[in-house]
Amino acid sequence: MKTLLRTSALLLALAAALAACSKAPLTVPLEDFSISVDAVGNTAGQVVYPKNAAQFDRPVVDVKTIRLSGQVTVSYTAVQAPLVMTFYARTADPGAAGCTDAGLAWICDAAGETPISGEYSFANGETQQVTLGDPNPEVLADGINQGRIWIGAEVTSGAATGVTFDFTQMVAEVTVF
């Protein structure tokens, strides 16, 4: 994951520099990646973030907005299907923002968090188009500009174990103005 974020940050930095020269949005393809978690369940109005922020090199030119789009295939052992979730992002340290330290993760009240997607419903083995940074593309940009970001999820329905999210054909659309 760190290698992917480092590579993505470098590509986004290059994209931002090129977009600054052309004053046009730039589209950058990203490498495929996967995220695996042991278990997922209804978070009851809470957003769960990883304990540590994703960290990467800051771009040479600040970016204004970033939208990520592509395909996601979710595989899991269902306890209760489907998994229904919304993705969120934050740049402020959850520990300084009134979130609860749950050991391996931070738990924050969804009402105070910033969504970066609509709601998605994932059946086991299903592939679907997703967009992160719509709404609120500036949150992803702020994270890239600061060199760290937490990306989490609120699960509103479903429960599963052995969950893997395979992100493929991902593209970053970057604007600097």
Where are these regions (language model features)?
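Post-signal peptide N-terminal segment of mature Sec-exported envelope proteins
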Residues: 29-51
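Sec-dependent bacterial lipoprotein signal peptides
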Residues: 1-21
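Cysteine-clustered segments with highest specificity for TGF-beta superfamily mature ligands
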Residues: 114-168
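A short beta-strand element within beta-rich, extracytoplasmic domains
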Residues: 62-79, 168
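Acidic Ser/Thr/Pro-rich low-complexity disordered segments
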Residues: 93-115
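Bacterial lipoprotein signal-peptidase II cleavage site
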Residues: 22-29
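Short, low-complexity, Pro/Ser/Thr/Gly-rich segments in the mature regions of secreted, periplasmic
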Residues: 165-177
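Short, surface-exposed beta-strand/strand-loop-strand elements in extracellular ectodomains
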Residues: 79-98
